[in-house]
């Protein structure tokens, strides 16, 4: 603003002289005006360039806040050394490396992760979240799918339950606000069972093994991994699986769309270069 005012002042003064001074003064006026305008344009360009540089620096310094579940093996869990590991954890790391963004991941639990994203305390979550139309309609925005999984039922190893018919009058366990909960809820009236809700899978599994509930519903690869690796004392009941759905990275705030776009681009790259298959094989064989 000060530069423009100066240009106007110089121009007005010179024009006043030209009225009395003839053609030489007119030439001087034109030269002065052109030079001042050039200075103003250069200053504006410098300011714009500085703003772009500042914005770029801010973007490069940004650390995205990502949340995940606490115990959803093999997708996220804490190993014997206390380190957070799993398919989700490694996929996110590979994508961030491919796309060149920084992030911090916090293992806070399924319910807490949902709440953190909805409250704006986290930018996104990766926690084996199935992509559904219902979740999309409630405000969630998903990446492309990165893993297909279905849900099924498991019982204690010594149980004689062989299907849904054996659940009548009994209680089954599910994880709150999960696809497995939706699956069980869709069957409970038909087969006459009650539902008990848990915050995490390990606690739910212990309820089955301990006899507090007759069965549990959970994502099939999660139960299979836990049964195989921890001698859990459960078995998956054949013929109880539903149709598979894709897991996706999720955000709740549309202003974070950049994060989803980077996830999608990176996912495509790590599938193409073999890194994705390497990660999955590490945990599922």
Regions found by a protein language model. Give the residues of each.
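Bacterial signal peptide processing site
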Residues: 21-24
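Extracytoplasmic small-molecule ligand-binding "clamshell" domains
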Residues: 59-129
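Extended ligand-binding regions for polar small-molecule ligands
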Residues: 89-98, 158-161, 171, 176-179, ...
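Short helix-initiation/N-cap motifs at beta->coil->alpha
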Residues: 89, 104-116, 159, 195-210
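Acidic, polar ligand-binding/catalytic clefts
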Residues: 93, 102-166, 234-235, 240-241
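Periplasmic-binding protein-like
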Residues: 70, 147-155, 224, 228-265, ...
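C-terminal motif of bacterial Sec signal peptides marking the signal peptidase cleavage site
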Residues: 15-19
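A ligand-binding cleft/hinge motif common to bilobed small-molecule-binding domains
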Residues: 129-137, 185-186, 209, 214-243
